[in-house]
Amino acid sequence: MIDMLVLRIPFKSSLVSERLDSKGNYVSHVNLAEVARLSGLTLAAHTVEYAIDGDLTVSGLKHPYESLPSHYAGIALKIFEGGKNFEPCVELKASPAKLLQGHNVFGPTSFELCGLEFFGAFAAAMPELYDLCDVTNTVVGRIDVTFSAKVANDHIANQVISFLRNVSNGQTKKTRALDYETTVMWNEGSRHRTLVAYLKHHEVQAQIKRLQKKKSSHLTIYEKNCLEVLSNPDLQLYAVGLVRFEARLHTRFFENFGLPRKFFDIVKYQDNYESGSFNLICDLWKKSFKDLFDAFKGSDMNVYDDSKVYDALINNFSSVTKSGNISNSKANRLFGFYRRLVNEGYDNVAQTMERTTFWRSLKELTSVGLSKAQLMNLSTDNNVVPLVQMINVDFSQQYPEWYVEPVSIFNRSNVVSINAA
């Protein structure tokens, strides 16, 4: 799936000033004030000065990020005025999957389809600014390609993320400062590629909660449409147990792979790709994750499915705080005790834990249906699984049976002739 796309659309040459600086570097820029006058765009000023006679002087003009509306999500738009070795452009940034279908649990792999949605939304929302742009020379600044491994449930998926926190290989280094409970990242800040693994079901649930917390009157139209899509129980069920592997690819990676920089050249490249258009996205992903997945070979991890135990503890030991929030702290503490019994054995835990705390915790565990005999014989000996078997990214199983590829609402001939570009 193409999970994120950043397009940089240059301005028409008549609006761009070009020169070489004293060191021979190419410098180009566009007059933001003139662009604003022609397009009706609103700019921000770094400095505003008032003279005694009332004259107003504005300097340091810039264009802040703004959002273009679409049916399901916004497109981030920003104008860059240019500089040394950087052409002035309009940058568009969004998840094509969210634009086209309201979610990115799975989604399209066609650059042509994704680009049509970007250009169509841009032309519809800001036709005057669109007319100032040289659309056919659009370049790609970043592509996120994403595929998922499916495990039995979210409990096991959490174990996979925990294991991945200790994995790195070759030029793929873990970014420790950006670890979260359900996310692990490698190579943050790289100009080549950044890799991320995270739990999709957790992200979907967090997005739903975030939208539901807003008053209905404060939701935008596209947020309401998005919430309706995310509330689909089939979609939520499909997201359970999905471990998402996302590669955020930058221009240096494009060069190493042999991918063109210009967007319409990429469209043609994909159309003519030897093994098929879908496989271009697969091959980009495989190349980006090769070092990491090589590190998986020969690695084993303990896999335990204790989701029923955890659910029973949540049901019996959750409480409501004074502020009205639900607290799972006691259930989590008891589950941690249960996991110690699994990993260290009953006798070892009994000998190393404070006696009163041990017996109280044991009594509370047995109150949810576990017998003392069971707790004395927990073992992980039969749960060792090769990591490459656990993390199986099957490219033929990336969509549910009911998936239908979305279609752009925009007419290609009214936006830009992709085939003729």
Curated annotation (Swiss-Prot):
The keyword Hydrolase applies. Keywords: DNA replication, DNA-binding, Endonuclease, Hydrolase, Ligase, Nuclease. InterPro entries: G2P, G2P_C, G2P_N. GO terms for biological process: DNA replication. It catalyses: ATP + (deoxyribonucleotide)n-3'-hydroxyl + 5'-phospho-(deoxyribonucleotide)m = (deoxyribonucleotide)n+m + AMP + diphosphate. GO terms for molecular function: DNA binding; DNA ligase (ATP) activity; endonuclease activity. Pfam families: G2P_X_C (PF05155), Phage_CRI (PF05144). Its EC number is 3.1.21.-, 6.5.1.1. Belongs to the inovirus G2P protein family. Isoform G2P plays an essential role in viral DNA replication. Binds the origin of replication and cleaves the dsDNA replicative form I (RFI) and becomes covalently bound to it via phosphotyrosine bond, generating the dsDNA replicative form II (RFII). In turn, viral DNA replication initiates at the 3'-OH of the cleavage site. After one round of rolling circle synthesis, protein G2P is linked to the newly synthesized ssDNA and joins the ends of the displaced strand to generate a circular single-stranded molecule ready to be packed into a virion. This is Replication-associated protein G2P. The lineage of its organism: Viruses, Monodnaviria, Loebvirae, Hofneiviricota, Faserviricetes. The gene is II.
